[in-house]
């Protein structure tokens, strides 16, 4: 194989082209590639951090939701307990009021019975005195009437 001037010229031109590319073209391309690599690495790291933050936030939300559910259940339990207490208090008050009303009714009936009984005794005594006056045929004085009535009332 012959090495002629064309081949040497081509070698020199190629060497100059390689040197020119390495000096002026290659560094901006390498910088662009490195910049892009760092951007991609940062984006991946940011995505990973966001994914971790999302998982942490999801766990926090689940914990807060569980705590809120427990708190809501506690509030419902307390409300039900208070409702039952109020119902028991109202029932007790109603029973107490019922007992008072019944006792008052019995007392009123008993007082009315005693009043009617006393009224009846007085009428019976007056009738007895009137009957005795008619039998005796004369009138007994007022003081004697009262004495007789008092004795009859005491006996009844």
Swiss-Prot record:
Q: Which GO terms describe its molecular function?
A: proton-transporting ATP synthase activity, rotational mechanism; proton-transporting ATPase activity, rotational mechanism
- Protein name (record): ATP synthase subunit b
Q: What does this protein do?
A: F(1)F(0) ATP synthase produces ATP from ADP in the presence of a proton or sodium gradient. F-type ATPases consist of two structural domains, F(1) containing the extramembraneous catalytic core and F(0) containing the membrane proton channel, linked together by a central stalk and a peripheral stalk. During catalysis, ATP synthesis in the catalytic domain of F(1) is coupled via a rotary mechanism of the central stalk subunits to proton translocation.
Single GO cellular component annotation? Answer: plasma membrane
Assembly behavior: F-type ATPases have 2 components, F(1) - the catalytic core - and F(0) - the membrane proton channel. F(1) has five subunits: alpha(3), beta(3), gamma(1), delta(1), epsilon(1). F(0) has three main subunits: a(1), b(2) and c(10-14). The alpha and beta chains form an alternating ring which encloses part of the gamma chain. F(1) is attached to F(0) by a central stalk formed by the gamma and epsilon chains, while a peripheral stalk is formed by the delta and b chains.
**Which HAMAP family does the protein's record reference?**
ATP_synth_b_bprime
Question: Record's Gene3D superfamilies?
Answer: F1F0 ATP synthase subunit B, membrane domain
Keywords, in A-Z order: ATP synthesis, Cell inner membrane, Cell membrane, CF(0), Hydrogen ion transport, Ion transport, Membrane, Transmembrane, Transmembrane helix, Transport
Supply the source organism for this entry.
Answer: Haemophilus influenzae (strain 86-028NP)
Q: Which InterPro entries match?
A: ATP_synth_B-like_membr_sf, ATP_synth_b/b'su_bac/chlpt, ATP_synth_F0_bsu_bac, ATP_synthase_B_chain
